[in-house]
């Protein structure tokens, strides 16, 4: 039977010359865009699919685009989108491709509009990347907390290099009385080592802890140093407990503390400190603020951030946080593993996370048992 167009949806038709819009065969859809399969190499075919998606994404305010394929184009299409056994694949960064069947001839695939995906990533980014002051200055601290200096400032080694830049600036501006870098070896350590080594070849990072890498970084680049290094912690939980032990062992007074962690993990670090040291005034200042936008049908950062994760890794880290922060039997809160204090998840964040799961599937970072607390 003839193919029926889906009302209100844009369509891209992938087909052979025989199934082109010029064909007289009424069973083939013409679509809003036609990408012809003609035996060219996979990269060229893939680029043409991306181009059609980008064109529709620029003009379409709806949430879905249908890709209709036929004949030999199907196999090329599956390879182009990196099709997986769970029925998903990707058109660049435009979103998930979900399999649907139409009779025996056509396979229809749904793509989530990248503009909505960018917005949802930003919602998660803002929620996870807490900043309690707009800028880390004495004036801001005085205005909000009535203090010119915090007792302690901590940089956690899970951060990207931007965290080192913030710490160095804070040291020069005397934002705190004492400075600590916390971090042994964890799931982000090797990435940090490689970033520093690639950008600053004179800084040797092999086998160093995160605290040692950042210490060498701020010394070499900014000529400053932290007062203390904590080099044994391996995860967000013992980042906090080992830090508190260090403060106690060195008789460091701590009524107020600035926490600076990677933006993806800042909220969890705050919740961890609230569990183990509820009487300390916590000042959150995530190491960066990332804003994601749709650009030419792809997701990109609106401005460069020093040492920033690639987009795929950033999304994976963000999506891994929401199940951890959710206070249920599977989360890290009191109702679950009891690693952190209760965190309230706003409905807007829950909705954004749910929609991102439609785009990326279960793209969350699983906890690595190698870095669990002993």
List each model region and its residues.
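Conserved histidine-centered catalytic loops in small-molecule metabolism enzymes
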Residues: 1-7, 102-118, 309-323
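Phosphate-coordination/substrate-recognition cap region in phosphate-metabolizing enzymes
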Residues: 1-30, 171, 178, 187-189
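Short hydrophobic/aromatic-enriched beta-strand-loop microsegments
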Residues: 2-6, 85-94, 177-181, 279-286
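Short glycine/proline- and acidic residue-enriched helix-loop micro-motifs
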Residues: 26-44, 229
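Beta-strand elements within well-structured catalytic alpha/beta cores of enzymes
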Residues: 60-69, 258-260
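Domain-level recognition of soluble alpha/beta enzyme cores
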Residues: 84-109
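A structural signal for short, hydrophobic/glycine-enriched beta-strand patches
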Residues: 118-308, 367-374
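A conserved mid-domain beta-alpha-beta active-site/ligand-binding segment of alpha/beta enzyme cores
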Residues: 293-357
């Amino acid at each position: 039977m003839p193919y029926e167009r889906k009302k209100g949806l844009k369509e891209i038709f992938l087909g052979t010359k025989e199934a082109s819009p010029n064909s007289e065969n009424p069973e083939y859809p013409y679509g809003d865009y036609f990408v012809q399969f003609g035996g060219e190499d996979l990269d060229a075919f893939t680029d043409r699919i991306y181009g059609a998606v980008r064109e529709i994404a620029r003009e379409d305010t709806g949430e879905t685009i249908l890709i209709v394929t036929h004949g030999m184009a199907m196999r090329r299409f599956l390879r182009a989108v990196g099709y997986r056994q769970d029925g998903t694949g990707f058109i660049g960064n435009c979103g998930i491709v979900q399999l649907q069947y139409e009779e025996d001839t056509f396979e229809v695939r749904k793509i989530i509009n990248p503009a909505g995906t960018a917005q949802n990533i930003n919602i998660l980014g803002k929620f996870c990347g807490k900043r309690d002051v707009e800028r880390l200055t004495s004036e801001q601290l005085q205005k909000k907390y009535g203090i010119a200096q915090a007792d302690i400032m901590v940089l956690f080694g899970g951060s990207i290099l931007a965290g080192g830049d913030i710490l160095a600036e804070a040291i020069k501006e005397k934002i705190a009385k004492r400075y600590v870098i916390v971090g042994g070896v964890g799931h982000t350590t090797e990435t940090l080592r490689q970033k520093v080594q690639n950008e600053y070849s004179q800084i040797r990072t092999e086998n160093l802890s995160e605290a040692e890498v950042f210490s060498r970084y701020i010394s070499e680049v900014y000529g400053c140093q932290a007062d203390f290094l904590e080099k044994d912690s391996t995860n967000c939980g013992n980042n906090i407990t080992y830090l508190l032990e260090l403060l106690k062992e060195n008789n460091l007074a701590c009524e107020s503390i600035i926490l600076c962690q990677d933006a993806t993990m800042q909220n969890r670090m705050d919740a961890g400190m609230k569990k183990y040291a509820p009487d300390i005034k916590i000042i959150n200042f995530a190491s960066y603020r990332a804003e994601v936008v749709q650009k030419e049908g792809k997701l990109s950062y609106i401005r460069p951030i020093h040492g920033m994760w690639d987009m795929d890794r950033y999304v994976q880290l963000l999506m891994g946080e929401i199940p951890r922060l959710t206070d249920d039997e599977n989360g890290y809160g009191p109702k679950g593993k009891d690693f952190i204090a209760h965190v309230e998840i706003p409905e807007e964040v829950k909705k954004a996370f749910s929609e991102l799961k439609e785009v990326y599937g279960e793209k969350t970072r699983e906890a690595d048992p190698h870095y669990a607390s002993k």
